[in-house]
Amino acid sequence: MTSRNYLLLTPGPLTTSRTVKEAMLFDSCTWDDDYNIGVVEQIRQQLTALATASEGYTSVLLQGSGSYAVEAVLGSALGPQDKVLIVSNGAYGARMVEMAGLMGIAHHAYDCGEVARPDVQAIDAILNADPTISHIAMVHSETTTGMLNPIDEVGALAHRYGKTYIVDAMSSFGGIPMDIAALHIDYLISSANKCIQGVPGFAFVIAREQKLAACKGRSRSLSLDLYAQWRCMEDNHGKWRFTSPTHTVLAFAQALKELAEEGGVAARHQRYQQNQRSLVAGMRALGFNTLLDDELHSPIITAFYSPEDPQYRFSEFYRRLKEQGFVIYPGKVSQSDCFRIGNIGEVYAADITALLTAIRTAMYWTK
């Protein structure tokens, strides 16, 4: 174990500010009103306000990673008579398909391939052909490739067909402006350690209250019962059903404060966009090519093809970058040899410039 701090160029966990880390130095009692009312309830209100100004929405915090919340939503929102259309073009859409299968949830998997944008006309045709579909679920920012999926167009379809709409906005909420009411989203799922720039430990769901209230008794799990977690927080002023990740929650409260100080989601989105554009321009100047065309990219993470040089090994490239204080991600695309670089978190223009210099130094196969 090393005490050296690296710059994490990943989609989360990510590099956090010193003050977010310092917020975890305080020990909270999970029964204390200062914590539940003063911190948890404030977070819930702030998250809902970030998602929409419209009435009728609420937020629920849930222990665990983002996948725990995805599974909680699927397992709680769909009744035994329901069926979900899962739009998948990467590992995280595929994970929803796997979850649905394990929980015995009726589903239709529309897999459009890892490097293709979902075809909205194809989704329209599926909905038209199968009236038993009651829900639609999809990922917004698919970090497998860095693709940003068309949640607005699919939301319009969900509204037109009267379907419940579930969006995994794990790596976009807080970093890309959105109004979930305008997008017709019924359940939005995200995590503490993504664009809000907190640390791992809990995820959250922002839901249409009317939909959530109908979930009573549906859950396939005790601990992942979204309705029960919501009622506990509502009825007990922020109390969690089971042990609250107190230090992570305090860090998240500080991260929300820093998001506001930066200028809100619009300002953070602008920084992320500039980071990503500078990264892509610099990498192309070094001879790297992006997996996706520019119009498909999110401002969150970018996949680059691995060099074709026979001397290149990702593990060696990674090691040389890490020696210089930078950590990147291996590829996750099954049919393409690539690696990924994220640009969210406490990462600024000077960091991208320093990273590009480090990459040039680490390109041992060109020496």
Swiss-Prot record:
Cofactor(s) required for function per UniProt: pyridoxal 5'-phosphate
UniProt keyword Iron, yes or no: no
InterPro entries reported in the protein's UniProt record: Aminotrans_V_dom (IPR000192), NH2EtPonate_pyrv_transaminase (IPR012703), PyrdxlP-dep_Trfase (IPR015424), PyrdxlP-dep_Trfase_major (IPR015421), PyrdxlP-dep_Trfase_small (IPR015422), SP_NH2Trfase/AEP_transaminase (IPR024169)
Recorded GO MF terms: 2-aminoethylphosphonate-pyruvate transaminase activity
Pfam families xref list: Aminotran_5
UniProt key word Transferase: yes
Catalysed conversion reaction: (2-aminoethyl)phosphonate + pyruvate = phosphonoacetaldehyde + L-alanine
Positions bearing N6-(pyridoxal phosphate)lysine: K194
GO biological process assignments: organic phosphonate catabolic process
Lineage: superkingdom: Bacteria
Gene3D superfamilies in UniProt: Aspartate Aminotransferase, domain 1, Type I PLP-dependent aspartate aminotransferase-like (Major domain)
EC number: 2.6.1.37
Keywords: Aminotransferase, Pyridoxal phosphate, Pyruvate, Transferase
NCBIfam families, alphabetized: PhnW-AepZ, PRK13479.1, transamin_PhnW
Subunit structure: Homodimer.
HAMAP family per record: PhnW_aminotrans_5
Family affiliation: Belongs to the class-V pyridoxal-phosphate-dependent aminotransferase family. PhnW subfamily.
Reported function: Involved in phosphonate degradation.
Stated name of the protein: 2-aminoethylphosphonate--pyruvate transaminase
Organism annotation: Salmonella schwarzengrund (strain CVM19633)
